[in-house]
């Protein structure tokens, strides 16, 4: 399992794998977390990092009582598979 940190001051969730940083960017807007972009560099792709970033970000939003607006296509497809 990948360790994901919420970097609130940078408006994103981050994971560092083998020294390479992946992240999911978000914005807070009127009780909603707008998930805008997911970046997983090729050297760490295919390891489930994007899924862990998304799972953690969505769980955090739900714990805070916030709605999720999946503007990122990866987050949108992940939510369709994990309602």
Predicted feature locations:
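A short helix-loop-beta-strand connector motif used in the catalytic cores of GNAT acetyltransferases and
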Residues: 7-13
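Short, charged, intrinsically disordered terminal tails
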Residues: 77-83
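Conserved acetyl-CoA-binding loop-helix of GNAT-fold acetyltransferases
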Residues: 46-59
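Conserved GNAT acetyl-CoA-binding A-motif
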Residues: 60-73
């Amino acid at each position: 399992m990948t360790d994901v940190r919420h970097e609130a001051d940078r408006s994103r969730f981050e994971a560092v794998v083998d020294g390479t940083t992946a992240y999911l960017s978000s914005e807070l807007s009127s009780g909603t977390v707008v998930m805008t972009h997911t970046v997983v560099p090729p050297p760490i792709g295919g390891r489930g990092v994007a899924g862990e970033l998304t799972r953690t970000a969505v769980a955090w939003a739900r714990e805070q009582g916030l709605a999720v607006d999946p503007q990122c296509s990866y987050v949108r497809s992940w939510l369709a598979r994990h309602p």
